[in-house]
Amino acid sequence: LRRSQILSGDILFTISGATVGKIALVKEEIIPANTNQALAIIRSNKETLRPQFLYHWLKTRIIKNIVDKNQTVGAQPNVSLSQIGELPVPSISLEIQDQICKLLDSIDQVTSSIRKKIIHLKYLRKSLMSDLLSGRTRVTI
């Protein structure tokens, strides 16, 4: 059970199933928690590699291509723990990592906000279409 315990800052990497390669950064609010065998726990040395930077790096197209190329496909797609351990990670100063994370985090916030607005606009469109088609709302031309 100890090997399956996750800590804040860990990265969870799906290694089995239809979602191979999906990742998540563990936040303090979900601790204590454990994983199952379909997830790899990636724990960085925080003195040389920021978890947030590693998270952003593992989301890149470069890593996705490597994972897609190396997964074995049987009943379910799989990636081995040794393959995860062999993924390349850039060696960049903590200062540069922090700058990159700040930029990417702000882009993620804007993207999330836009997605929420799109969902809301689709809901409004659906409501308006329903009102127009049912005759509850009339349009004068």
Question: Which residue ranges define each predicted feature?
Answer:
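A short glycine-rich beta-alpha junction/loop motif
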Residues: P32-A40, R50-Q52, T72-E95
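Periplasmic-binding protein-like
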Residues: I63-V67
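ATP/adenylate-binding site constellation spanning eukaryotic-like Ser/Thr protein kinases
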Residues: G17, T60, L81-I84, K126
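Residue-level recognition of specific faces of alpha-helices
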Residues: K22, A38-I41, N78, Q83, ...
